[in-house]
Structure formats: structure tokens, C-alpha cells
């Protein structure tokens, strides 16, 4: 009896099980202990009676439990089919033990019979408990040992329904979907911050670093079963959202633009995503502006007149163009000086054949005696030289441009046309007046006024300097990006002008010496006051008018102060972007040479001071032909001991190719 109790206690529950399962196991253990004591007593009594009687039935010395054959089967059909009918009630288990195992105990030998009986009972109970646990685990996952396959519980239900003749879909509406297809997850560790997503989310973009299994394999950590990237953590939120949203890329506010751009390039999201992101950030595409003509001769001409940094001749042409523009602007301003304006008016009157004004003055020289005409005027000669250069430059650029449609859509080319046309219109009008003679003083005065207006357009030549000035280009980009803010500023000023001009008019209506005779007369005062200029030519006199003027000045300060910071922010953005581009150009010039890169090609890449026309074309075509000039990977990898040096050279060469 003592041996039986010790054997029963030795097969106790596992103390490392969870609390709920451990309590149930202890309850079952107490039931088995009581049952074992009763069974041991009955077995000892039966064995003693059998020895004394000297007889007994000759049966097999050991029988398996009736349910063990079904429980231990690993057949995928019979084993799974028997799982649903295998769990008897605990009370039935007790009866089953008594009816199946105990009648055969009479054949056991007295020596050690109690210990063997208890061992068999304990093993059978443990096997039944293990099978019950396996059946519970089978609800989620099942392993077929014979075939080495892994399938979900829903697959087993589908197989049982199809092969075992089970009716319906079963499983409470579960479908036959593989576990790996719907629930396969991947863990991504970015500098210690772990992200978890599904494989199908990354598979939407198979060309990217995370979407291509082969590309991301080199970052896999088998010990932690995760992918590790030593990259910027805040940027990865937007990178992962790019996969989750199906292609929407938005930079976090706490990540600088250059850092986020590097992360986008590292994760290989593609050029299309990068270009779209740059457009959202305010960048302007320049692919069309950077296009080159297909004809070689036109290409050289286009490089000379369009890209001053291409070569020394192109830089010289740019300097000449800037000087001509400055001379034209200086002449436009000097001809309005009083000492030159009288002669200019006289020449214009002589050319138009007028007989009034200066010509009616007795002190004025007579037209027949004066040898001055518009064609021998120094200002006209200088203006003609400038126009000849502008016309030549425009015609050559129009001839060599890659696309005529894009050429005439460019705002800089439109400015060139506007700056050239007034000269030819003025020249044609002067020639027509000289050939036609005097046709009336009123008609001549009208034509003279029109010519003055047309000549005023010459002031737009100053915008031609923006072609050669980065500062003016930045200002143009700033104004174009701030059109909405400028529109709001004008709208606010318009509302303020209407409001305060009306208020000051009615406030000063009873004052006889007031300057505000009408509301339109007060518009000028409202604009000057709101912009804090304050000329003082118009001012309120009454107390009510002064109060309105004070409110107008305060409202003007607030109105201008609201949109101005946004405009300044846009200017800083474009300025820093231009600075970053210049820094990248300097880094490109300091790139380490590759041993397989031709020295003359690298020399022309580092400095563009050559004198031939073909140098810049080769410089700009380097992006297309650099792959043929750089060392191939196979050649670099076949150097043996110099593999590390070759790898560095390849990386530097790639940097050169990217920066170009």
C-alpha cells in the first residue's frame, strides 16, 4: 500500500504549468490517488486469492487501454477522424479503468505487482492527458509528421469534410485558407525601434528594398528573427506608411528634407516616388529644361548660349550678354536726363515732321539747318547695337532649341521678345513718318505718345539678368510659390482700403478744408497708411478722422505681418535648396577617381575650363556614358587581394554617376 501511494505521488502535475491548468491537474491527481489506493487494495486481495487458490484464468498479461489505439495513431485521416469521438467523461474514465484493466491483474506475479499496476495506470492517464492537450492545440495548428506539412485547423476541417464525409463547411464558417497566407508577419527593427507588419503589405512594391526578398535578406537577423536597419527612426514611420497606403509618401515634420531624401533612396522607393515627393515639397521639375538637341551641331550651339557653366566660350558669351543688358538699361535711364532730353525731343519732333512745340520757338534751330536726325543720335546708335545682339542671341537660341513649343512657353524667352519688339516698332513708325511727311499735328502727337509707351516696355530688359543670376531665380521661385499668400495680402489690403477710406470720408465730411473730397480720393491715403509709408500729402484734421487713421495704421501692420512670414519661409527654403545643390556639386568635384576611369574624362568632369565646344557636351553626356567608362563589377571583384580597394572605387564611381 505504501509503495502504491509513493508511485502515485511521483506522477504528479507539473508545477510550471499556468495557475488554472495546475489547479485542474491537482484535482485530477487527487482523484487518481484515491482511485489508485482502492485499485491497489483490490489488486493485492485478488493476487493473494489467486495464489492461495492456485488457479486463475490464462489471459494475456498486459492489455492496452481501448482508447489508446485511436489516440496514438498518426494517420492524417483516421487520427483526425477519431479526435472528435475520443474525449469521454471523467466518470466514464474511472469505470473504464476498472472494467478493462483490473480483471487482468490476476495474471500478474505477486512480486512487485502493485508497483507495475500503478505504473501502467499512471502512464495511461498521462497519455490521455497529453492527447487531450494535443487535441486542444489542434484547434489552432497541426503538424503532419508523415508528410512534413504544416496546415491550419481550418484546413483539417476542410479535409475532414471532404474526405471523411462530414456534412457542411463546419468550423463555424471557417474557410480553407492557409495560415501563412493571411497571418504571415515580419518584424523590422530600425535602430532599436521594432515595427511589425504583414508580408503582403511589403509585397505591394516588389522593386523596393523591403518588398524584394532577395534585397532585404542581407539585413535579416536569424537570432532575433527580424530585419535590422541602422537608419533614421522617425523617417521609417513615413516609409512604412508608404507601403500601407499604397504609395503615399509624406515627410514627417520633425525630419529634415535632406535626411528624408537619403532614407527614400536607401529603401529604394523608386524615382517616381522621389519625384512626386519633391513636387509636393515645392520643387520644380527641370527635365524638360535640361533636354539637349539630338543634332550635334545644334547641341553645341545650345550649350554655348544656354549653359554658361559648360565651357569657357559659353562663359564668355554669358558675360557679353550681361554687359549688353546693363548698357541698354543705362542708356534707357540716361536719355531721360534734362541735358539730353531737350535734344531728344527735338530729334523726335524733327523726325515726325511736327511744326509745333519746340519748332515754333524762335530760339530753336530750324529743321533744315540742323543736321540732327534720329539715325545719328548717339543713344539710338547704342540702342541699335544692343538690339542687334539681343536679336542675334534670340534667333540662335530659337534655332538650336530642342523643342520650339517649349521654347516659346518659357517666360524668359517671352521677356526677350518683349524687350526687342519696341525698337522695331519705333523704327518702323519713324520711317513711316519721314516718308509720309506731316499728316496733321494731332495724329503726330498721338503717334509720339504711343511710341513713348512702347519704349517704356524696354525696362523689362532688366529681367534678362535673371538668366544669369541665381538670386533673381530664387526670387522668382519664391514669388511663384507664394502666389496664394500674395493673393491673400492683396485681398486684405483691398478690404482695408475700402473700409477706412469710407470711414475717413464720412468722418471729415463736415470739415470744409479737408483733403478727402470723395471716397476714391481717400483710396490713396488708405493705401499709404496701411503700408506704413505715410507721405503726409493727405491727412485727417478732425478727431474722428485721426481715430480712423490710427485704426487704419494698426490694421495695416497686422494685415501685412500675417502673410509675410510665409513668403520669407519660402525664400529661405529655395535659398537653402540652391545652397545644397552647390555643395553636392563640390562633393562631385572632390570624388575619388576610379583606376579604370579615363583620366582625361575625369579631368573634364572636375573642371570645365576647356576651350573646345565638345567639352560640355561630353560633360553633360557623362551620365549616359559613365557606365561604359567605369570599371565593371566583375573586373573589380576579380582583383583578389585588392577587393576592398576596388569596392571603394566602385562606390565612388557610383557616387560620381549619381551626382552628375
Swiss-Prot record:
Gene3D superfamilies: 1.10.287.70, Potassium Channel Kv1.1, Chain A (3.30.710.10), Potassium channel, voltage dependent, Kv1.4, tandem inactivation domain (1.20.5.600), Voltage-gated potassium channels. Chain C (1.20.120.350). Its main location: membrane. Residues 335-378, 433-447, 506-519, 540-546 are extracellular. The chain crosses the membrane at residues 313-334, 379-400, 412-432, 448-468, 484-505, 547-575. The keyword Transport applies. Residues 520-531, 532-539 dip into the membrane without crossing it. Residues 636-647 have a biased composition (Basic and acidic residues). GO terms for biological process: action potential; potassium ion transmembrane transport; protein homooligomerization. Keywords: Cell membrane, Cell projection, Glycoprotein, Ion channel, Ion transport, Membrane, Phosphoprotein, Potassium, Potassium channel, Potassium transport, Transmembrane, Transmembrane helix, Transport, Voltage-gated channel. Residues 1-312, 401-411, 469-483, 576-660 are cytoplasmic. Glycans are attached at residue 360. Residues 24-147, 636-660 are annotated as: Disordered. Belongs to the potassium channel family. A (Shaker) (TC 1.A.1.2) subfamily. Kv1.4/KCNA4 sub-subfamily. The N-terminus may be important in determining the rate of inactivation of the channel while the tail may play a role in modulation of channel activity and/or targeting of the channel to specific subcellular compartments. This is Potassium voltage-gated channel subfamily A member 4.
Amino acid at each position: 500500500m505504501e509503495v502504491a501511494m509513493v508511485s502515485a505521488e511521483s506522477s504528479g502535475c507539473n508545477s510550471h504549468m499556468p495557475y488554472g491548468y495546475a489547479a485542474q491537474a491537482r484535482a485530477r491527481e487527487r482523484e487518481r490517488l484515491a482511485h489508485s489506493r482502492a485499485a491497489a487494495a483490490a489488486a493485492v486481495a485478488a493476487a493473494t486469492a489467486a495464489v492461495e487458490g492456485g488457479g486463475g484464468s490464462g489471459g494475456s498479461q498486459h492489455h492496452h487501454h481501448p482508447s489508446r489505439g485511436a489516440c496514438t495513431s498518426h494517420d492524417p485521416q483516421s487520427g483526425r477522424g477519431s479526435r472528435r469521438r475520443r474525449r469521454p467523461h471523467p466518470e466514464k474514465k474511472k469505470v473504464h479503468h476498472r472494467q478493462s484493466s483490473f480483471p487482468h491483474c490476476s495474471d500478474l506475479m505477486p512480486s512487485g505487482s502493485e508497483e507495475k499496476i500503478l505504473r501502467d495506470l499512471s502512464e495511461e492517464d498521462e497519455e490521455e492527458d497529453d492527447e487531450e492537450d494535443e487535441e486542444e492545440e489542434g484547434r489552432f495548428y497541426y503538424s503532419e509528421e508523415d508528410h512534413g506539412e504544416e496546415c491550419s485547423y481550418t484546413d483539417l476541417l476542410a479535409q475532414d469534410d471532404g474526405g471523411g464525409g462530414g456534412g457542411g463547411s463546419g468550423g463555424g464558417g471557417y474557410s480553407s485558407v492557409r495560415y501563412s497566407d493571411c497571418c504571415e508577419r515580419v518584424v523590422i527593427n530600425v535602430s532599436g525601434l521594432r515595427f511589425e507588419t504583414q508580408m503582403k503589405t511589403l509585397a505591394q512594391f516588389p522593386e523596393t528594398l523591403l518588398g524584394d526578398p532577395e534585397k532585404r535578406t542581407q539585413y535579416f537577423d536569424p537570432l532575433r528573427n527580424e530585419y535590422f536597419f541602422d537608419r533614421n527612426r522617425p523617417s521609417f514611420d513615413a516609409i512604412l506608411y508608404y507601403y500601407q497606403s499604397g504609395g503615399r509618401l509624406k515627410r514627417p515634420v520633425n525630419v529634415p528634407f535632406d535626411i528624408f531624401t537619403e532614407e527614400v533612396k536607401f529603401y529604394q522607393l523608386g524615382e517616381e516616388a522621389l519625384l512626386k515627393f519633391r513636387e509636393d515639397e515645392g520643387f520644380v521639375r527641370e527635365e524638360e529644361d535640361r533636354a539637349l538637341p539630338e543634332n550635334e551641331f545644334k547641341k553645341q550651339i545650345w550649350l554655348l548660349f544656354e549653359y554658361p557653366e559648360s565651357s569657357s566660350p559659353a562663359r564668355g558669351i554669358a558675360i557679353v550678354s550681361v554687359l549688353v543688358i546693363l548698357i541698354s538699361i543705362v542708356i534707357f535711364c540716361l536719355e531721360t536726363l534734362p541735358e539730353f532730353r531737350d535734344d531728344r525731343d527735338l530729334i523726335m519732333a524733327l523726325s515726325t515732321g511736327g511744326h509745333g512745340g519746340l519748332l515754333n520757338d524762335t530760339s530753336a534751330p530750324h529743321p533744315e539747318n540742323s543736321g540732327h536726325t534720329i539715325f545719328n543720335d548717339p543713344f539710338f546708335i547704342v540702342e541699335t547695337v544692343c538690339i542687334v545682339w539681343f536679336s542675334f542671341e534670340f534667333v540662335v537660341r530659337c534655332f538650336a532649341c530642342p523643342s520650339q513649343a517649349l521654347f516659346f512657353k518659357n517666360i524668359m524667352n517671352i521677356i526677350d521678345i518683349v524687350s526687342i519688339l519696341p525698337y522695331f516698332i519705333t523704327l518702323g513708325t519713324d520711317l513711316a513718318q519721314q516718308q509720309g511727311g506731316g499728316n496733321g499735328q494731332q495724329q503726330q502727337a498721338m503717334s509720339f505718345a504711343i511710341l513713348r509707351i512702347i519704349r517704356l516696355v524696354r525696362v523689362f530688359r532688366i529681367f534678362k539678368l535673371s538668366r544669369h543670376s541665381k538670386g533673381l531665380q530664387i526670387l522668382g521661385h519664391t514669388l511663384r510659390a507664394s502666389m496664394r499668400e500674395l493673393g491673400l495680402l492683396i485681398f486684405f489690403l483691398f478690404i482695408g482700403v475700402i473700409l477706412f477710406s469710407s470711414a475717413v470720408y464720412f468722418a471729415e465730411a463736415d470739415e470744409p478744408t479737408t483733403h478727402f473730397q470723395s471716397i476714391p480720393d481717400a483710396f490713396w491715403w488708405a493705401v499709404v497708411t496701411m503700408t506704413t509709408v505715410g507721405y503726409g500729402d493727405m491727412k485727417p484734421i478732425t478727431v474722428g478722422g485721426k481715430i480712423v487713421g490710427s485704426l487704419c495704421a494698426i490694421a495695416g501692420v497686422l494685415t501685412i505681418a500675417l502673410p509675410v512670414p510665409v513668403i520669407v519661409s519660402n525664400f529661405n527654403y529655395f535659398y537653402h535648396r540652391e545652397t545644397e545643390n552647390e555643395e553636392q556639386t563640390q562633393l562631385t568635384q572632390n570624388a575619388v577617381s576610379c583606376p579604370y576611369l579615363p583620366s582625361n574624362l575625369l579631368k573634364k568632369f572636375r573642371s570645365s575650363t576647356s576651350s573646345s565646344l565638345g567639352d560640355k557636351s561630353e560633360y553633360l553626356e557623362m551620365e549616359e556614358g559613365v557606365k561604359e567608362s567605369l570599371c565593371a563589377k566583375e573586373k573589380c571583384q576579380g582583383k583578389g587581394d585588392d577587393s576592398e580597394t576596388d569596392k571603394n572605387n566602385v562606390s565612388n564611381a557610383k557616387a560620381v554617376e549619381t551626382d552628375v
